[in-house]
Amino acid sequence: MSPGRLAVLGVSLCLAVPGVAAGPLRFWNLTGATITKLELAPVGTQDWGANQTANDPDGAVDADERLRLSGVQPGRYDVRLTDKTGRVCVVRNVEVVADRAYAFSVSEQDLRDCDR
């Protein structure tokens, strides 16, 4: 097989790898709560971005639901979320990645230090 064909085959295989996100970044809510506000800021800053739950048709992210993120690039962020009971939590130094089915998730364990 020629080197050119091998290169094309390699690119095709890379694009077909299961589990690699080919589209927009997504958040996965692994908490047991409905999240009504989700904001990201570069680590260590208070520069909170837009409320990402506005991207959901009902304006909230239910437990085990995924949410398309808007205007977010891969990197490290502090994540501030509010659930439907009014609990506000900040999860620090979260890695947002582009090469998975979801960019990041938050679980109930991540919220263990939040006030209830």
PLM feature segments, named:
Residues 23-25, 65:
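Structural beta-strand segments of beta-rich domains
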Residues 82-112:
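Structured interaction patches on ligand/partner-binding surfaces of diverse proteins
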